[in-house]
Amino acid sequence: MNGQQPSSQTSAQADRSIQPLALILLLALAAVLFFVGLGSLGLTDRDEGRNAEAGREMYETGNYISPTFNYEPRFAKPVFIYWLMSLSYHVFGVSEFAARFPSALFGVGLILLQYLFLTRCRGPVVGLFGAAMLLLNLEIIGLSRMALTDSVLIFFTTLSLYGFWLGLYGEGRERHYLWFFYIGMALATLTKGPIGFLIPMLAVGLHLWLTRSWGLFWRHGFPIPGLLLFLLLALPWYLIMLNIHGQRYTTSAQGDTIGRFFGTMEGHGGTLVFYLPVFLLGFFPWSGLLPFAWYQAYRSWRDSKRSGALPPSQTSVLDIHPSPHALEWFTAAWVLGGLVFFSLSSTRLPHYIGPLFPAAAILTASYWNRCVTDQATPGLRAAIHTITAVGCILALAFASLPPLYAKFAGKLIDEFPLAGQVTLGPGPYTVASIFLVGMGLIAYFGFSETRRPAVFWVAGGSLALVVLATTQLIFPLVHHFVIEPPQQLAEVAGVNLGPNDRLILYGQPRPSLVFYAKRKAIVVPKNEEANIKPYLTQPGRTMILLPAALRNRLPFETMDYPVLLERYGYILLANQSLIHVPEEAEQPPVRIPGH
């Protein structure tokens, strides 16, 4: 590859060859990063717990239409992710691994899709760069290892937009790729609601407007048949839910869509620039290249517009072939449109911008390919400086975690009863060291014309080592002392309670506990202790799971309830003794680090 974009059908055809060894190694790395230790960490709260339990209840009840959580209707997310989880439970059994398996599987599928698309459009070198950059960043790895909707959503929105590109600008049988534009949007809408079609439509609409290609799309994009296909796939489930639940479903759906855009939900707000640092950190280490890559795409489009290369309208089949830089324009519009949309939304969370990462990876891959073949690439040195600066900031942040944690541990009591008694171990310092060494090597190689290609491998390798250190050194401590204790007690409670008995979860709400109890639970937040009283006079066994520090806040009637089990700051009370205690629950607790 010489860094030039294909300018003819012949050159484009010559550059489409897939490199089997590179693809196998890429998918193997994705499988390692996404699947290894997938079930070793307990479900996190709150979304993972809710999603995994909704899928489990679907698996248990056989109700594949109306999702439930804690055996009450769950309207927050559409049904597709629960279908996938239920299928996974059928294959692997109910477990953390099975709950997260769909995310990991679609994560690998996303990397494969990225490689195949970009190799076809820009050749195997850029294809490898783009797929590896999409794989080796903090956000995609995180989302592909969690029981969330985002990994599946990103796959389908990406499939939709790649189908649009290949179908609109292809010839002959390639035109049929356009159907994936509508299929991908429909399945994305069944995965996470309206955002499933809004992201593709924003990217496509902005691209068609900037390139004056609306006429081309209207003639060759199958808009009417495509709309009918989209409605045929996406609409029936929503109509069935409306028929079952009526106004209740409509009100909830409006709250989870329009309500999230115009109002802050569950405290997830932030400023208009919230996503700039999120992009900088989540897409690291490639985020250092992104501003310069985006600007180069913008400048290319601006120069083409000024020179008259963009026609007033495209009026014939001969105009289907796009500009050599049109793919970069398209992905720049994809990133810009999505970033503006999510920034204007009142509810903001880091994983919302995940659907923009495939486009960001294409931009940075094309820009990096130019950097290693053209020493005069604008912004190159500034990009290297940006990568190393962000990496050093991350190193400082990880190195500062232990002292900051020690200082503010007292404020974490509600979420972490043993805060202040457990240390973070060597993990943060190990991660900080990896960042510092990696950034030093990037600076060393990046400012040398002959050694510059090594930056890609050093940056990717550093990120992989950071993930490895985090999963092996930090996550086990977090799991053992923060996540697992109440989940283990919930599992014991579930084994010992009959259909007419009660489990009360008191304190900070933890939806994952319902998953481990595998039964309906009564959730009573802190300061609402009076709601516990009516259940204490009912016949049968009553169990209460709570942080030990809140024991004295319970109603007086529970004062004679003995503590049946205690685990790292959590206790399980009951008005009757246990019937069965799992063997692992009888094991004595291990020594607390730092004591």
Task: Annotate each PLM feature.
Residues 2-12, 20, 175, 179, ...:
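Membrane-embedded architecture of ER/inner-membrane glycosylation machinery
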